[in-house]
């Protein structure tokens, strides 16, 4: 037996007006709101205004911390307000949302999400990333998918532009990773549906990405910003839920194996998830020998200011042996879809992608 649930979503600058009705569907009269400091400053006024005059009580609005670590997850789990609430409203980027989603497993709570940045698809997914206290990857948790997503393009447009930029970088991975991971064929219905939806993920980025980034840099809510937010949150989020089930995993591949391995490499600088993943996409195309897409995606990376070389994310070819070693511990390497990964091929792909990137910067 398989049951698939997908998040409802509301998009628009007036999206919070739908919040009371969405809560009523679950009989919810008590909520706790959890998020990052900036996220709460951006979203809380609109949420509180929407709930004013209703029978919904806000028990608490709390800052979760700065990363989705076990310590921060425990703070949510141990909060009396979060224990009493009918619904947890998670506001912020992926780390804030993943913290609340993971805490909700133990609390057995319904989660609504408010992505105040669109740096990844966490607002829609039944998967969450958990980090160690030092920032390295611990692994994944598998919560229920959020019940409802509230996407406010104005809030996203007024957030720091680098998160929108990195979100485009992360979303670039969804279509090629799923296409590669499923390329052995013989997919059952749910995975096949995920693959079909994955085919919709890249083109909106190529169409609206440059304009959307320009608009966000001017804090301008626009059609391009809305379309990118929908693609990052909804398209890629739905794909994640359909391609990640108990009996199969096609949700990520070489690009995320690369990213996850980089988390264990000590280096100067701070690099956003999607920033590094976008370089991992080039590694994926080098790995599969897809020169046409390597060149297309690399050109788009350059146009967007996303990385095309190792040096742009604080790495060098001297780090490749360590990247191979750390990649062994990643879920993507362990899953090995559509076939087992090899150190030799992975190392060669990193070198090839890096070499091609250098030709673009020459």
Segments (PLM) and residue ranges:
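A short, small-residue-rich loop immediately preceding and capping a beta-strand
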Residues: 80-103, 107-118
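Active-site segments that bind and position negatively charged phosphate/pyrophosphate groups
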Residues: 188-299
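ATP/NTP phosphate-donor binding region
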Residues: 1-84, 310
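Short glycine/serine/threonine-rich phosphate/pyrophosphate-binding segments
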Residues: 16, 40-44, 70, 95-102, ...
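Generic secondary-structure signature for well-ordered alpha-helical cores
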Residues: 24, 52, 56, 135, ...
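C-terminal charged capping/lid subdomain of soluble metabolic enzymes
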Residues: 2, 18, 290-362
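A glycine/threonine-rich phosphate-anchoring loop and its flanking beta-alpha core
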Residues: 105-198
């Amino acid at each position: 037996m398989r049951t698939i649930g997908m998040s409802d979503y509301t998009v628009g600058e007036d999206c919070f007006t739908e919040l009371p009705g969405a809560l009523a569907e679950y009989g919810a009269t008590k909520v706790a709101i959890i998020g990052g400091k900036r996220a709460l400053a951006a979203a809380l006024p609109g949420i509180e205004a929407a709930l004013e005059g209703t029978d919904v009580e806000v028990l608490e609005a709390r800052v979760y911390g700065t990363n989705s670590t076990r310590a921060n997850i425990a703070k949510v789990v141990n909060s009396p307000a979060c224990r009493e609430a009918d619904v947890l409203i998670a506001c912020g980027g992926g780390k804030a949302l993943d913290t609340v989603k993971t805490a909700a497993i133990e609390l057995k709570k319904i989660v609504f999400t408010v992505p105040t940045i669109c740096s990844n698809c966490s607002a829609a997914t039944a998967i969450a990333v958990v980090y160690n206290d030092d920032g390295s990857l611990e692994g994944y948790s598998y919560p229920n998918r959020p019940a409802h997503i509230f996407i406010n393009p104005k809030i996203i447009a007024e957030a720091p532009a680098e998160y929108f930029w990195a979100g485009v970088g992360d979303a670039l991975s969804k279509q090629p990773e799923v296409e590669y991971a499923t390329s052995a064929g013989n997919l059952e219905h749910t995975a096949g549906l995920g693959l079909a939806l994955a085919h919709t993920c890249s083109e909106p980025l190529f169409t609206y990405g440059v304009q959307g980034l320009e608009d966000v840099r001017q804090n301008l809510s626009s059609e391009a910003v809305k379309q990118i937010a929908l693609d990052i949150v909804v398209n890629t989020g739905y794909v994640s839920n359909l391609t990640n089930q108990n009996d199969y995993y096609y949700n990520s591949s070489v690009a995320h194996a690369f990213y996850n391995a980089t988390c264990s490499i000590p280096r100067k600088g701070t690099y956003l998830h999607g920033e590094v993943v976008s370089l991992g996409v080039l590694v994926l195309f080098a790995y599969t020998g897809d020169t046409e897409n390597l060149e297309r995606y690399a050109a788009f990376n350059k146009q967007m200011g996303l990385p095309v070389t190792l040096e742009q994310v604080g790495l060098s070819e001297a780090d490749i042996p360590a990247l191979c070693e750390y990649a062994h511990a990643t879920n993507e390497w362990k899953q090995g879809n559509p076939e087992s990964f090899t150190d030799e091929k992975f190392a060669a792909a990193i070198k090839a992608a890096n070499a091609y990137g250098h030709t673009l910067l020459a």
